[in-house]
Amino acid sequence: MKKNRLDTLLVEQGYFADADEALRAVLAHEVKVNDVYATSAAVRVAPDAEVVVRNRKRFVSRGGHKLQGALDAFGQDVRGLRCLDIGSSTGGFSDCLLQAGAASVACVDVNYGQLAWKLRQDPRVSVFERVNIKLADPVELGAPFDVLVADLSFIGLAALAPVFARLSQSGTVFIGLVKPQFESRPDETERGVVRDEAVRRRTVDEVRAALADAGFDATGVVESPITGPEGNVEYLVRAVFEGSRVDGGCGEGGRS
């Protein structure tokens, strides 16, 4: 396994903007590698080393860690790919994609002003605010995309599967965060939390079935490495679009 300089690794993983900033943090004893304070920014470190930076976040939000867990679990490479982040919010998913080498990310959200400044000013990022993905013109967003990611609240992924198809082409990879509290019935939650594992698993199956109906092959599911609000257990599902885009920007799986 090839080792990289620590300062290079810190920049690649998004902790610092450049090597000089990383060096200052190392000299200030703010960086640990495998639970030992680093004394040199030039030390060679394995890619899978445990790196901890005091008072620094790797991603702009917790969502980045969720998506990173999925990319690792699925072995998904996004280098050089065009991506769409549906429900981008602060931009945790987008941040993760860019750090993983994505060529570009289009960020779509119904709200305004939430996207982190570091992403807003990144030339690889296109921002679409106050946009309802159900009503959006796929062409205006830049569809079809190589990768779709989705982290949505108050609406289930299952209901939007045909929309995802309209944004896809044959081979498009979809990775979505399944939040059982928004996929299940109100009587199946307790103060907004789905505690019954059988209910959680059923919601995942329903999302996979909806994706299949829309032309996707749901190839994998993994539990999110961190929980959602109030300790909700969440899941990430990966699917590949098997249809093809037709006139009007709608994938075959998006037809009724």
Identify the residue ranges that each predicted region occupies.
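Conserved alpha-helix/loop element of class I SAM-dependent methyltransferases that forms part
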Residues: 62-81
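Conserved SAM-binding loop of SAM-dependent methyltransferases across substrates and taxa
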Residues: 90-101
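Short, glycine-/aromatic-enriched active-site segment of Class I SAM-dependent methyltransferases
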Residues: 180-196
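A short glycine-rich, Lys/Arg-flanked "PGG" loop and its adjoining helix->strand segment in the class I
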Residues: 158-175
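S-adenosyl-L-methionine
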Residues: 106-159
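A basic, amphipathic helix-loop patch mediating RNA/tRNA/ribosome contacts
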Residues: 1-47
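Conserved class I S-adenosyl-L-methionine
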Residues: 79-89
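Core SAM-dependent methyltransferase catalytic element
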Residues: 226-250, 255
